[in-house]
């Protein structure tokens, strides 16, 4: 593998479009004259029995991993391996022990030292044969 292949294996870019049903996104690479990738799969927490689903929004800064290129696919054979925070979009939390998901509408799911907080901008729907609240 030559050095140009190594340089292109891990790239930082900005999500330019999203295909929700396919769980893929296209990424623009400003350092590559705004080259746009093919649709890249987004890594998830699970994809078989237990499935995770979280697709980055357009304009999210992401890290991409591209496969070595013996077949000539270039930057079309790869994955979005994650998003990251930067100065213009800081983390929503500052405590490293807190786990949370904050949504643009203000809704929140948060775990903090044994306490789970769920706040919804509209409504909360619970479906189960039995619901215990104590």
Task: Indicate residue ranges for each PLM-predicted region.
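Hydrophobic packing positions characteristic
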Residues: 1-122
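Mixed-charge, glycine-accented linear interaction segment located at domain edges/termini
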Residues: 119-134
């Amino acid at each position: 593998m030559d050095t140009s292949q190594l340089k292109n294996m891990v790239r930082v870019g900005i999500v330019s479009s999203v295909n929700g049903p396919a769980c893929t996104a296209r990424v623009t690479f400003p350092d590559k004259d705004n080259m746009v990738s093919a649709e890249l799969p987004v890594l998830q927490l699970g994809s078989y029995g237990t499935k995770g689903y979280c697709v980055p929004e357009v304009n999210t800064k992401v890290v991409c991993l591209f496969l070595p290129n013996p077949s000539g696919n270039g930057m079309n054979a790869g994955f979005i391996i994650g998003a990251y925070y930067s100065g213009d979009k800081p983390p929503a939390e500052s405590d490293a022990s807190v786990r949370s998901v904050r949504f643009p509408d203000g809704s929140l799911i948060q775990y903090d030292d044994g306490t789970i907080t769920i706040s919804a901008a509209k409504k909360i729907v619970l479906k189960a044969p039995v619901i215990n609240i104590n």
